[in-house]
Structures are given as C-alpha cells and as structure tokens.
UniProtKB/Swiss-Prot annotation:
GO molecular function: protein-macromolecule adaptor activity
UniProt keyword Cytoplasm, yes or no: yes
Region Disordered, annotated ranges: 1-35
Location in the cell: Cytoplasm
WD repeats, residue ranges: 986-1029, 1033-1074, 1087-1126, 1130-1170, 1176-1216, 1219-1259, 1268-1308
GO biological process, one term: positive regulation of cell growth
Taxonomy of the source species: Eukaryota, Fungi, Dikarya, Ascomycota, Taphrinomycotina
Subunit structure: The target of rapamycin complex 1 (TORC1) is composed of at least mip1, pop3/wat1, tco89, toc1 and tor2.
UniProt GO cellular component terms: cytoplasm; fungal-type vacuole membrane; nucleolar chromatin; TORC1 complex
Function: Component of TORC1, which regulates multiple cellular processes to control cell growth in response to environmental signals. Tor2 is essential for growth. Nutrient limitation and environmental stress signals cause inactivation of TORC1. Active TORC1 positively controls cell growth and ribosome biogenesis by regulating ribosomal protein gene expression. TORC1 negatively controls G1 cell-cycle arrest, sexual development and amino acid uptake.
Gene that this polypeptide is encoded by: mip1
Pfam families in the cross-refs: Raptor_N (PF14538), WD40 (PF00400)
Name this protein carries in UniProt: Target of rapamycin complex 1 subunit mip1
Keywords: Cytoplasm, Meiosis, Phosphoprotein, Repeat, Sporulation, WD repeat
Family stated for the protein in its record: Belongs to the WD repeat RAPTOR family.
Amino acid sequence: MNDRISEVSGSSRARRSVLSYGTTETGSDRYTENSNIATENGVDTASSMIDGIQSGFPQPRHGFEEEYNNAEYINMLEQVFYMYYTDKRHRGVISKKNAEPTETIHDWRMRERLKTVSAALLVCLNIGVDPPDVIKPNPAAKYECWIDPFSLPASKALEAIGKNLQQQYETLSMRTRYRHYLDPAIEEVKKLCIGQRRNAKEERILFHYNGHGVPMPTASGEIWVFNKNYTQYIPVSLYDLQSWLGAPCIYVYDCSAAGNIIVNFNRFAEQRDKEALRIAKQNPNVLAMPSHTSCIQLAACGPKETLPMNPDLPADLFTSCLTSPIEISVRWYVLQNPFPNKLNLNMLLKIPGRLQDRRTPLGELNWIFTAITDTIAWNVFPKHLFRRLFRQDLMVAALFRNFLLAERIMLVHSCHPQSSPELPPTHDHPMWNSWDLAIDNCLSQLPDMLDAESKGIAYEYKHSTFFSEQLTAFEVWLSQGLISRKPPDQLPLVLQVLLSQVHRLRALILLSKFLDLGVWAVDLALSIGIFPYVLKLLQSPAIELKPVLVFIWARILAVDDSCQADLLKDNGYGYFVQILNPNSSIFPSSNISEHRAMCAFILSVFCRGFPQGQLACLNPQVLSHCLSHLNSPDSLLRQWACLCISQLWENYSEAKWSGTRDNAHVKLAEIIVDSVPEVRASVLTAFTTFLGFPEKTEEVVAVETYIAIAALAALSDASPLVRHELVIFLSHFVVNYKKQLMVVAYESSLADILEKKNHNSISASTIYETVWQAVLVLAADPSIEISLAAEAIINYVYQSMLNSELRESFLAFLLQHLPALHKASLSKDTDTNSVTSDPKPHPFVPSVSENKILNRSFSLTRSLKGLALSLAGSDRASELLSLNGENKPAESNLNHLTSAKVPGPPAFNELEYQSELDMPLTSYLFDWSRKYFTEPQMRPNEDDEPGSICYNQRLWRRNRNEKLIYRTRPLAEYSTNGRWNQQLMTFNNTIAPRKLMFHQFEDQLITLGDKDIIQVWDWRRNRCLNSFKTSASATTNVTDMQLLNEDDVALLMTGSSDGTIKLYRDYENEKVELVTSWNSLSDLVFGDRNASLLMSWQQNCGHLLVAGDVRVIRIWDASKEICYANLPVRSSNSITSLTSDLVGCNIIVAGFSDGVLRVYDKRLPARDSLTDVWKEHSSEIVNVEMQSSGMRELISASSDGEVKLWDIRMNHSLQTFSTDNSGLTSLTVHSHAPVYATGSSNQSIKIWDTLGQNINTFRENPRFLNQPKPSSLMCLKFHPHHLLLACGDNTDSRVNLYSCTKNEIHTDSPNEF
C-alpha cells in the first residue's frame, strides 16, 4: 500500500525516463544520466579527449589533462547535457489568448436537475379473466411481482401484487411518493393523474402501466382500463393522458404491442409542442409549457409483438427486469445454464443479504450489476444522453440501468423493448459476460450458504474478484505507451469502486493517473460523475488518502474553478489548509513540499474572485502558511505560495493589512531575485495585487513605496516573463499614483523636448521619478510585448495629463515646439546611418541606466508629437508643419533599407495584443501557470517515449553526431600537410558578410552581414535556407552570434551593439521565431554603431559571457535567466576579443584594444577573478581563441600580424610567430586540428600549424593585374569538425568555402564531407 502511495505522491513535476528531458530546479532541460543516447557535451565528447590522451597524443595544455583523467569529472560531462531556452515560458508571449486553456471541458454539472417525486402505479389484471385478444398456452407465465395471483383470493392477490410492485420500486428510489391503483376505472385514472401533476408541480412523475388483464393497445396507441362495474374495457386516449399528467414524465408500459404507445405518444407530443410554440409567438406573455417530446418512455416490446409466456418466467418479465433485476437475472441465468447443478428456482429468491449492503452476497451482486450497466451505458450511449439518463435523476438512472437487462433477456424471447429516446443496442456488450461470471460465483456458493444458515453455522463467503480484475484492466490500459483519447471501458467502474474501503486507495491512485493524462481525461471523469465522490472524501480522516486526493483536486481545479462554493460547504477547503500548514506532520508522502504546492494552488483557485473564499482562508492563517514556504527548496511551492498570496490579496483590504502585520511585503521582496523566473514573476504578481488600498494613509504609501523599490530590481532581469509582470505592476502603481506620475511626466517631457541637461524639478530623485524612468526603459525593451505595454502606460499618463489642470499649459507648450518635435521625429525616422553624437542625458536616478532612457527618447518625442497633432487641430498643426517643409511621409526616406522580415515571438499578433492593453494592465500569469497542472506529470511526455517521432529524431541526430566526430577526428593529423586552397564553392550572399559561423553537425553556414541581415546556407548544396533581419533599429547593429543546443535542435543567439541579446528558434526556415531577448549590457553607449558586444557561450554550464565597451565581463546564467557574476576587467581599454574554456567553463581570456590579454577564473570571487595579465602584444588584439578539444591551444593575434601561443599556467607566451601580414584583420583556430588561419586587409589568407609553419597562402578574391586592391575587413571561420574554411570580406557579398585536400584523404568532391 505504501508503494502505491509513493507512486502518486511522487513528484508532481515531469518524471523523465531514458533519453527524456528532465526539469531542473531552474527550469532548463537536460538529458538524464540514464539516457542511452546522451549527446555530445558542448562541442566534443570528453571520451574522445580521453581516447586521444590514452593513444599517445601530446597532453592538452593548461593542465586540463588532470581533469580529463578524473573519471567522475568525465562521467559528469558525458552523462548530463542541458538544453536551454526550451521551457514553456519560451514558447510564446503570456497574453490573454495564450493563457486561455487549449482545451475546454463540457458543462458537467446538471443545471436542470429533475427528480421523480411522485409515481402512479396502474395495475390492470382483472385476475381470472383473460382479455379477448390474448390466447394463453397451458402452462403459461403467471407470476406478477413474484406472486402467483391464483394462490390467493383474487382481491387479496391483487392487493399483494400492488404492494409488491410498490416495494420493488422503492428499492430504486425511497424518496418518491407512490400510489398504486388496482384495476382502476377511467374516472379514477383521470383523477389520479390530475392529482399527481398538482402535487408534483414542475417535477417528474412516473406512470407505470401493467395491461396484462386488458386488451392490447390500439393502433392509435390507446390503452385500456375498466368501467366502474368491470363490465367493459374503456380506452384511454394518449392525448388525454398527456393533458392529465402534463410534463415532465417517465412512462413504463408493460403490455403486449407496447411499441404502439410510444409511436403515437410521440406523434401527439409533437403536435402539442408545435401548438404551444404557435401560441407563444402570438402571445409572448403566456407561460411556456414543458415539452412533451422530452418525456421518457419505456415499453416492453415492439408494436406487433406479444409478451413472452414461458411458464418458468414471470408474466411481468419487463417489470421484473426494471424493478428486481437481481432476482430475474439469477433466475434467467439458471434457466439458460445447460449444466446440471444443485440449484432450484425456489432457492434463487433466498440469496442472503440486503441490496444496500455491499458486504453481503445480494448487495455485492447489486453493486456489480450497477457498475456493469453504468459501464455499458457509458461506452455505448452518446455522452449527452448518458448524462441525461444516468446522472440527472436516481429513478431514471435505475430504470435505464435495468432496461439494459430487459433488452438482453427479452430479446432471447423474441421481444424488442422500446424506449424514447431511442437507445443503441447493448445486449451483446462484452461486459455481460462479467455479469454472468459474478452470478455464477454467487450461485455456486448458494447451496452451501443456505445449508449453513439452516444449521446455524457461519459461512465465509468468497467475494467476487470482479472489481479487482477491472482495476487491473484499467491499470494495464494506463501503463501502455501511447494513450488513446478513447475513454477506457473501466472508467465508470472506478467510480463505483470508490464506495469500497477495500479498493478505494487503489482506485484513487489509478484515477489520479488517468487525470494526469490531460484536460480531456479530467473532462471525462467529471462528466461521468467523479465530483460528488471526491468531494465527500474530503471528510475522510484517512491519512493514506491525502496525497492522492490533493493531486486529484489539483487536476480538477486546474480545468474548472467553479467548485469554490462546493469547497466552502462542509469546510472542504480546510483539508488543504491543514496540509499546507508547515507544522503539520500528518502526511505520508516523502515529497510533501510538492503536495503543499498543489494545496497552495487549490487554495489560490478557491480565493480567486470569490470573496467568501478569501474570508474563509484569512482566518486559518493561509497567508502565514504561504509566507513560511517562501524559502522552501521546492520552486513550485515558492511559486504557488506567492500566487496564493496574490489571490488572497486581490481586492481584499483586510488580507492586505494582515500581510502588512506579518511583513509579507518584506519577505516577498527577499525572493525577488529567486533563481527561478516563474517565482520572480509570481512575486511581482503578488506585489501587483497588494496595490490599491482604498485609503492612502502614510503607512500604506510607505509600504507601497517599499514594494515599488523592491519590484524595480526586476528591471534588468533576463526573463521577459519577469519583465512583463514588472510592467504590469508599474501600470497599477501608475494608476494608483496618477497625479504624482502626471507631474513627473510633465516635467520629464519638458526636459526631453528642450534637451536640458540639468532640469530642476520637484519630483527629481523621488520614487515616482524612478518609476517613470523605469517605464521609459521598458518602452525600449527588446521584447515587443513589453515595449507595447510600457507605451500603453506612457499614453495613459499623457492622456490623463491632457484631461487634467495641466492640459492648457502642456498643450500650449506642445504647439509652441511642434515643428521641433516633428523635425526630431523625422530625423530619427529617416536617419539610418547615424544618431546624435551628443545625446542629452535624461534626469535619472543612479539605479537605472541613462542609456536606456536615451534609447526611448525617440518614442517619447513621437508620442508627444502625436498627442499635439490630435489635440491641437489639424489646420493649425498642418500650418506649423508646412513652415518647415517637412510634411512628407517619413517612409519615403527608408526605401534603401532591406525589406527582410524581423522575426517575433511565436503566434504573436501585435494588433490583437494591443487591444488587450487596458489600464491598469491585466496579468495572465496565474492562468498561464495553472496550465502546469493540466499537463502530464507522472509519465514522460509523448515526445520522450522510445519509438516516438521526436525520440527517433533525437536518436538519429545523436548517431549522426557521433559518426561525424568519429569520421573527422583522424583528419586532424593531415591538416598540417594538406592543400587548403581548394575552393569548393562560392555562396552568393545578398550582402557583405561581417561574421561567419558553422553549425557543428548540420550542414549550415550562417552569415551576418550589414544591416543585421542573417543568412543561413546549406554549404553542402549551396542553397540559401533562410534570410531574416534581426532588428528594425537603425541605431544599432548585430556584432556577434552564437549557436546553442547544437547537439539537438540549435538556437541562434545574436548580440547587438546596444547590449541586446536575442535568441531565435527555427532560424533555418521561414517560420523563424524569437525565443527570448534582454539587454545584457545596459552600460554600452547608445547610438555608437562602432561599439561591439562580444559573447562566449558555454553550453556545458549554460553560461553566457558578454563583454564590450564596458568595465565588466558579465556572466548570464541561462537556466536561471539572471546575471551570475560581474567580473571587473581591470582596464580602461575596450575588450576586442573574448574566449573561454568550453569544457570546464572556468577560464576566461579577454583581449583588449591596447594589446593586453587578461585571464579570469570565474570560480574565484569577482574581485579576485583576474589571475594573469599578458602584455606581450604591442597592438590591438584582433582575436584570441581557445580550442574546444585537441591540444586545447590558446592562440592570440594582434593587428600588427603577431601571433602567440599561450598556456594559462605560464606568465609568458610559449611561442611567437610573425605572419608577415600587413594589417592583420582576422584569426580563426580549428576546434581540434592543430591549424589556424589569418586574414589581412589585402585579402591574403594564410594557413598555419601550431608550430608556426605556413601551410598555404592564397588570396580570397584574385584581381586582374591593374585592378586596385581595396582594403577590406576579412572574416574567417573553420568548421568545428570538417577541414573546411569559410572566407568573406566587407567589400564583396560572396562567401568562399575552401577545403583541405590530400589525395590519400579527400577527393575534390564536397560530398566527401
């Protein structure tokens, strides 16, 4: 049992199997160490390095061989490989559309729940007199309600039959009021029916008709009763019957030719409904009458059929099936059984026990019968019909369960029971075999049970294994690989098993596994009726049920939050409050933190938009419990503790005051720098809901100011998810302090327009000034959804300003400076080559970069100009603009720009998103986060299952990668004596390249050209795969690019001169998408297109090193999306080149503009990270590069043509070579071969080995004799594995590809690669 508990109470996060992606604390994906296809580590496998060392090759430099001989270190590198930027938060913008559930559930609650409150039981037997149209054989069926009518006097027999009929119906529903009318006259029938409708009001009436003693119904459907003297049969028109009984009703017809009644009843019902509709149209004030076509009817046989007269069966076989299914089932089973046994028909009515007691033989049979008929109906009937007939009314459900039995039994006797609504056939369903087996198990013990009972001896009854076997079948279905969305046959049985304490835990565990399959599974479970069961179980004190019940409730509330009132009733929510309590120890699961996270989620849904829920959660200290979990090691618990607090605070001042007393805002501020982006975003959501006290007392202002200051720490966050929540928080802060922000915006706008360097204002250095400047920073955010949201805040403030007392002065000022505004706008719209050389600083606090404000100055100016044009009047505005002759559209000056597309986030519609930007902005983080509980957590994703398409693709890529490395590794020794001037092909790039890069394993060459155009080439087929523009900005340019996750599906990372980092998915095709973006170096000088941002990506540890014209090397942690460290460069010169150890990821080497090389170790504290300074170069460092495998050579080159080899353990270079290049412009080093290449401004390319020997010299673009040789900046790049070299320069758009050829090794065909 404990094993079963742990099975469910295990991690609610994704459990990954072999090859699967796992989820780390920080959210990045990884291949697990058990993976059979664990991929390459970064650029090369550690095993290949070890093989090289053990094969007698020279030892790697820098002392790395010590690490390679460490088995634990090598295992770590080979067995764990992380994938970055593949989490759910990187799959799209969190907008209203994206936060909506991808699947919806049906309305599983019965909104129009009817009850059968009254029943009229008409029995027309006329015992002793056969009707004229019936010829009975001898012997014939005679039992009515299990009574022989000829064993008693006629009057007593009739009375006994009526009494038994009522008792049989009472086993179906005790709450229904029954009246039986025996051999009634027509007057009595009329009076009975009218009285029944009057008493039932609008509820359902049961009308049971036994016509065994009267003629068959007429062709028009009339049924027969008696006159007062019992001398005549009197017909009753169905039209009259409908008038007397009204609707809704359920009719049971037990007579021959009963199908005629249904046919004619429906015909009259349609006529009545049409007439009612006509009257309603003529007089809308008339109350609508219930529809007669919705009445339910059950008939014993078809229109031309006669009831069976088998003497071994009761005469009212149909009634027996409907009201005493167990008795008739066992009798029919014995009659159908050809084998000899000890049973006789009299024994069958003596099965011990009670129907309501499941522990007795009779009760167990009844329980099994209910489960089987429910299962058959669920699997055969349409779902809407199942809900109407089996979940709306106890009486209707019981009758239809038993009707399935009637169909099975009576078909054998040439009767076809009819119903309205018509049902699909179920007589041959396989589950009937299980019913026969259950009967056989009981009857096989019946003689011994009766014998023991007669002797007064206790008998140990062997219970049926039906339910345990069905649970096993359900478990097998769940354990299969690909889960079909076809519901399992056993699902209704699971609900029945919940009634049993013996099987309850197992059933709950299996149910939780089923719900884990997704929204569709929860929808099925709710529609079948799971909710009342799990709601009632919240009252159970059983400790072993707590983990699984928490999981089930989390799944239900993740898709349907309409259960709040249900949880409030009977204190159901207290079940989860008790588990959430950190001092609670009554929990059997070892991973209680994850179940507490689910409890926090459940309570957050309970509070959301439900004031009664908020009030209920305030008293049992839910807030205190959540605060105590903010420092939990489980990130999911931290996240949902914050979100639960946010929902408790939403529009509930008392809860906010309670949080203030508990220092909730201080505790939340402490985790604003949490390692998980979702947690940081959740903190900001909680801050947002805290704002909005109705009264702004000093204490309230102080607390909200504290929160605003704490929230601004997220301004430099690398996760768009966090920054998006920040801009939402700021929108609420702006709305709450609108007057103060209007003053700040007014003064800031004047300063911006007048370009005042020192603008004194009453709001300077206040929190409102800081907030306003933060909004301006966010308006320049590289993520479009954030910048649009920030612009909405700016527009809101300006519109509020123009609707306030500042309107006149501000409008007059705008009109006065409108021409200047328009000129500034045009100049910034059209100037694509330069920006203002002396940008005016914006008044700002030290905590926010001024350059970010300047980056947004154009948008601010444009906004002000737009406001002025719209408010000042078109005539005056046109006049002012015409004075300057600048009313031509700005787009005419942009024709020279390329029309290449700029990728955005996946499925992002800017217009649709802007329509959602109402102030204050709405956060959809909660809805987005709750989707976690709709995704499978107990089993790997389908893509990670062996045999799936994605699995096979990943396996193929792994094999391809290993094969490529295995095939290219031996070529390294031939690289130093081959011919490198063999030109394989030329790529006709559309624009001159500035940087080149090969994919390690795909046949891709990526070029970065002017105007930030990136082109992706298939170098084997000389085909351009895709071309796109990384930015529409004319003031920055992309200066570096890297590839991430190359072993699987790579992402392309670009870095711009303004510090912006962008990542792209599917960059090789037209569906390229922006994954994420952020500003990595906010201190870079804005507008300096010569500024360079340099990057070094360390795949093994997920660190991105960023440097440029700043005084630090900033290290970003990709998994946490935060700044890991800032290493001081200890130099006033700019960094011109950056490299690092891509295996151990600890050593960083930077080259500077003054020729100095500096070595850093990021394992050391930041202030002590500088370990070596090499000053041997006398001119600017062009490039410094460390091999990722092979000898791990570290090579640097300066612009004067000097190349040096280094070992980080030495304080001087190992070797120095002079390339004799006049104006060396580029250096590239092969990843594992002992060669490097240099390029000069005269387009001369030289290939060298690491001993300083020149292998080849050739020119990139040969010219004719008298043609001048322009100076150019060359770009070179080796393929990481193949012996290929790509070359380009900034005077020609062509890119040439060269290979190292040697007759013994290669042919001249590129297919060799």
